[in-house]
């Protein structure tokens, strides 16, 4: 099975024939913070849970968060949920204690990443 979670899936943070090259994605409906919650509930050792996720594309240590998102995952998932469910930016900003401009920028970034990576979420095309 694949390891791509909803946060990564919506924003295209996976490789189609890498971690996305699988017949089943059992985590694709869960945001990243939910995967961490389930891991703790299942008793996964903390060393594994707290290991920094990495795209493994640089020789220097860099986390997925630093490389792709620039937003802490806890906040990212709340923003992503609001974007996905079309919660107004003003409401999202008020609930999360953020400036509305910051929420608008995040939503614009999500939209751009989602559009730019749409091909990753579709089946490969045939010749006919």
Give the positions of each predicted feature.
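ATP/NTP-dependent adenylation/nucleotidyl-transfer catalytic domains that generate, transfer
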Residues: 2-128
């Amino acid at each position: 099975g694949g390891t791509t979670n909803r946060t990564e899936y919506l924003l295209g943070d996976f490789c189609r024939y890498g971690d996305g090259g699988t017949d089943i994605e059992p985590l694709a409906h869960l945001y990243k913070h939910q995967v961490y919650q389930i891991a703790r509930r299942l008793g996964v050792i903390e060393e594994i849970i707290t290991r920094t996720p990495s795209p493994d594309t640089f020789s220097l240590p860099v986390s997925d968060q630093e490389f792709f998102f620039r937003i802490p995952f806890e906040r990212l998932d709340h923003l992503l949920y609001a974007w996905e469910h079309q919660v107004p930016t003003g409401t999202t900003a008020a609930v999360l204690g953020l400036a509305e401009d910051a929420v608008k920028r995040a939503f614009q970034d999500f939209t751009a990443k989602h559009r730019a990576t749409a091909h990753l979420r579709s089946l490969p095309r045939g010749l006919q």
